[in-house]
């Protein structure tokens, strides 16, 4: 369990009380598939020169699910780990938010399945489709629910992107991976918890990265599947790179301004783990020192909404109580988000 400071006991749903001051992180969890595909193997499969992927992305291996694994399996593992660290029984959770772009099925949503398997008998559950920014959008919504309802919320980011990438396209198959991370938030009257959130969207470039078919605009047909339209398509990688790097830096500045803080107050910056070059460009624009940047994309790849909760869980040993964490992400849509958390 993470260090506790003035955490309040969740009240029954019928009780009335003033909103809690903060939504604090009580526990974190991670789930990665056992199989890792080295970038050298991906290069051989795609006919790329040795070292091509590592030089351009910083990714040296990607966790990939087996044939019998799905998003819900990873989400359940990560959620169970977060609950265990928080030392909370499943009955204490009032809401589950699952940030994913790869639900088990188009219908129904996957969150209720995850809630059932985790034994969350008193929780609402819903999916959030915010692409790479989805986990931060979910944190922002969870923050309000925790404080208003004075209950605990389980937030999970989980994806199986290997099933949505074109295996013959290096722009996507060399980047995207599978994984899940989870955070338990609970009401607190102390200083720990979510300090500020900032959310943004620019739909003018919605098709920078998208899956052409499978929705109401272009339903799936055998012909569209044969053309690979059910897989991810990146229209212009360079344009997306520029927008994402600038967007992450801008989101970080906006949330700091909103909180009345500056970069010197931040102990750790945890960006969406898109690829090493994008993180470095966003870091340069933001002005964050490398020594205070969390970057583990080399071993987890890009699992979209899962990368930030994975970083929180896998690197938690580096964070000290009271540290201010800056989380930033930009995702397809184009969605951007930033969250400040006092650890």
From Swiss-Prot:
Residues annotated as catalytic: 132, 272, 302
Span list, region ACP-binding: 273-277
Leading EC class: transferase
Record carries keyword Transferase: yes
GO molecular function annotation: 3-oxoacyl-[acyl-carrier-protein] synthase activity
EC number: 2.3.1.-
Pathway(s) this gene product operates in, as recorded in its UniProt entry: Cofactor biosynthesis; biotin biosynthesis
Keywords assigned by UniProt, alphabetized: Acyltransferase, Biotin biosynthesis, Transferase
GO BP: any one term: secondary metabolite biosynthetic process
Lineage top rank: taxon: Bacteria
Function: Involved in the formation of the biotin precursor pimeloyl-ACP. Catalyzes the condensation of glutaryl-CoA, an intermediate in lysine degradation, with malonyl-ACP to produce 3-oxopimeloyl-ACP.
Family: Belongs to the thiolase-like superfamily. BioZ family.
Protein name: 3-oxopimeloyl-[acyl-carrier-protein] synthase
Organism field: Rhodothermus marinus (strain ATCC 43812 / DSM 4252 / R-10) (Rhodothermus obamensis)
Gene from which this protein is expressed: bioZ
